Amino acid sequence: MSDISPDYPTLQSIGWPWPGPPEEAAWKAVFAAHPQALPARVVEQHRTGYVVADTPEASLKAESLPEWQRPRFPSHERAAVGDWVLMEGKRIVALLPRRTSIKRGAAGAHYHQQVIAANIDTVFIVCGLDADFNPRRIERYLLLVGGGGAQPVVVLTKADQTEHAEDALAVLEELEAQNIPLRALNAKDPASVAALRPWLGDGRTAVLVGSSGAGKSTLTNTLLGTEKMKTNGVRENDSRGRHTTTHRALIPLPSGACLIDTPGMRELKPTGEEDLAEGGFSDVEALAAQCRFNDCAHIAEPGCAVRAAIEADLLDPERVANYMKLRVEVASAAEKLATRVAQNNRGKGSGKRPASIDRPGRR
């Protein structure tokens, strides 16, 4: 890392959000508390630690904050790929506030949040046009993205391997009506992948999410113009992938953007902070507000605007069923979150360290 003042133009090339020093009060306060420290971005996250960078070409292994090593330290308060940190030599001394993020409820019975990526402009939700194609899973990803401040874009790969790409787009037309961009492409073809260029401009950061075998690593290699990321095929019987990406990593692209590739995720649990309207269901939520009863379950109640829309072929009944399922999951997670916050507030009086829950603002 450099021992002089920050080189902000170079930092901008890896996603620094301003042309000079930080302009947000919360960031200024952290800088003021660590006047000898320099900013860097987390570009890799491993079980054993982090790799950070302050230029597109140079990176180093970083020593994390001691409290991050404690087993009970909240995982979402540790640094994630895309986070900005302050460094003194090789030591991380502070985590800067997140401007955006995508999170999920971590696997297990106890309530935990896991940050998938931080300080991102765009989330590419990648799904293959083979047996991997699953509109319900796409909707689940959209729910996790909604409210986190980033722009979702649905990317349908393997368009060269099917004659039914237009049919798949038609299935998702209710999403496109909500201004959620959809792109069907061949992840191996640079001309086809150029459809993503509007979201990969200089200084912007995007993250790829999706199941194993969806084509995320292939897409990364095409955007890089080189075979940097290892790729494997998928099993022919079910089109399931083999986890070619094993850790999250931030990669500078020739376009000037940064791309975060992530391992495939089998479990996509809500955190309880999601907004269904912002998470791809604004049309269903708007109709639900017109139902005769405030607690309408949208099953057989009189005056149900949602059922009326289904019967008029204006809404996909399977999508509405998924909406209702996700609504229950979000409510359940919100109850667990409220319990956790209450426990933390009680911990303040007992001298225990409370675990805050970050809520990124929209950029």
Curated annotation (Swiss-Prot):
Which of this chain's residues are annotated to bind GTP? Answer: 157-160, 210-218
Gene Ontology molecular function: GTP binding; GTPase activity; metal ion binding; rRNA binding
Q: Where does Zn(2+) bind?
A: 291, 296, 298, 304
Keyword list, A-Z: Cytoplasm, GTP-binding, Hydrolase, Metal-binding, Nucleotide-binding, Ribosome biogenesis, RNA-binding, rRNA-binding, Zinc
Classify the source by domain of life: Bacteria
Location (main, coarse): cytoplasm
Q: Which Gene3D superfamilies match?
A: P-loop containing nucleotide triphosphate hydrolases (3.40.50.300), Probable gtpase engc, domain 3 (1.10.40.50)
Q: Name one GO cellular component term.
A: cytoplasm
This entry's comment on the bound cofactor is: Binds 1 zinc ion per subunit.
Could you tell me the EC number(s) of this protein?
3.6.1.-
Any idea where the CP-type G domain is? 112-268
Quote the subcellular location field of this record.
Cytoplasm
State the name under which the record lists this protein: Small ribosomal subunit biogenesis GTPase RsgA
